[in-house]
């Protein structure tokens, strides 16, 4: 009888690991052979300093297979209770059109793409973002919009800082209407304190008594009232201050746009444009301003330019405002924003069109008006005279009974206290919702009929002088794709223009573009995770609490920290949150004078940008010839700072792609002067299972869940940047004004709008860790193996700029193109653009060293894909040789004219190289050709001729 293995022998404890890792055991051994090594352990011994190595396995549960992990998480999800939440406060029920759900949110062609720094291979999502910007411009009545921020509260804080930069007022005081959403007020207070601004909170009537540089007003306000803001705005302008208005986007289909009222900045959330509440996020915040403030605008702006053939091409405009270029002088530390969600909101407008959107807004308003009329007939006092979708009601001693009745109907109301309740209707509401609410407030025998109320004359909720009469969304893109067939094809046309992970490796250094497994993505669209309001009673979110608590425990085990704050919803926001905690810690010890932040010259641009956001003075620490932090320079500057030293911000492994041997000594030098160590978590993918930041000496670190822990980049967001802290910093992390968190001190300000940030994407990281368990170390080791394999194979053609012990690199490596540029005139940009012709996304250009390419393969890429990349790079090196040898002119060769498009091929060809050499330079390109949508984009033209709205349809035609 043939041998039959037992069930225990057939159990696959590494089932997901084998799916996640690109190279199998045989390929890994071949890569090790190329390095002259016998095992991965030998590679790690040669690469990672012994002093920081983690002894033993990570303290994590054994790995689950995909089905078991999904089943466990589904069990958690089912403990969330899906009530009808009419709480409002900036979060509303919405309907995601299925064509958008399936073809964007659930489509790796959209969610695995990177930020469009390389516009030639990102025209699809750039067009989608331009549509989004046009939508915001039209609805707000302003001149310019960016391509999203993290959430409404963060956008409000950014508006305050823009006002300080741009207002001519000399005041240091900022006014906030007390009727703003409480979470917005808290985030603005945190930012104002960090910048040293004086914050005045009061009613609009109080504004006249204060000299300010700006003010934040809510429209409609948090209680639903619609006020004419023109008098307040005129007062602000009279004292050369800026008027910032936080506006409900759906209401602007019916209300006079704030721009027409005189507002300088308008901001808010696009959540109710088809993006689920998700227990707080992710959602794209919008941000619009007058044209004169464009160079003070935070975040990415998509602009119209032209390509080398003179055709219309889109790109990210005015990048010199941003942190990756201006560093501590940047307008903001914003890096990752909410591109995927902005695209969904923009597509929502494209699909519904202006009439469809207006119908949704009118329906919500009509339902609210019917409810208001019925309650008024029965004597319920409404505290807001005017309304769009929200009623604030005075119910006196009946409050408790009404709340109990609402709970029996599984409806959440906003409980304001002192006999006041709020109710906000939304797109998901209908006549049945109104019937339930009438019964809740009036009792079952109220005698009212919704149909009869609807048939009667209803008082207008919107003041006559604030009813919108201006047009919007007149561009053809918003009036052409209303059938599902047309929408489906439009989405596919845009997707086909872009290069994402579902087509090729994206070898961007410092970005960790690893696999975003399908099983990790599935739970985010489960209704139990997607449809919860962030301010529901905790008992209704028990599944979320269990999942988040478990994820926090796992992240503590992985990093060595004592506590985790999940609130920051990007890496840059994690930096800001960590620095705020450090500042509060020093102040608690009577050392508030500590304001110097040491930052190595190689740091990410977000580091100095974040430091300036908490009023720290940045002092740069030099690096030595080996790319390491110059220890003597660091010790000298730490000593010079003395009792003013606040912290050091350091990335580990370094942004130069090496494990610095003296990192413990670096941390000790800072601690000796009373400072704290902030470790940038951008390169955590090279530590997991091998070392832990807290053990190395870090006091606080953020974790890019959208890098190391598999949340996809989404074309520029969403992300999550929770911070880990040691016990002494735990009391000083962010709290929340609506949902008080356990651990942080009561009264600590918030750093984002929702208590747990973008909570609905946390299941992605939970799934990844659950399915990997202690085998996370394998992922780290294979990532290091891949980087060293590439460095070994490419080093002869392109020198590897920095290496660590035994000539090894960490999980990424930097190729130095400066000698080649000097010899041939071919730049790192030429090589990056030429890679597109081979079907690759470019590596990171000129960071952290100008004239270089930084490559990070991640553990998810197979040896075959790595070899294909090597072959492309070596082929490009041979092409450079032809330029050096004079075979091709320096100004007319495949590199300087890359990338090549279909328009090149079908046009007249008069170049000294063949069409085949241009567009099919490799066997893979011949078999699986990816065509960039445009030729090389003219960046200078785009900034000199700034245009950031939709262009005529004919402009996209060649």
Curated annotation (Swiss-Prot):
Cofactor(s) needed for function: pyridoxal 5'-phosphate
GO biological process, one term: glycine decarboxylation via glycine cleavage system
EC numbers, comma separated: 1.4.4.2
Keyword Oxidoreductase annotated: yes
Keywords of this entry: Oxidoreductase, Pyridoxal phosphate
InterPro entries: GcvP, GDC-P_C, GDC-P_N, GDC_P, PyrdxlP-dep_Trfase, PyrdxlP-dep_Trfase_major, PyrdxlP-dep_Trfase_small
Record CDD domains: GDC-P
Keyword field contains Cell inner membrane: no
N6-(pyridoxal phosphate)lysine, modified sites: 707
NCBIfam families per record: gcvP
This protein's name: Glycine dehydrogenase (decarboxylating)
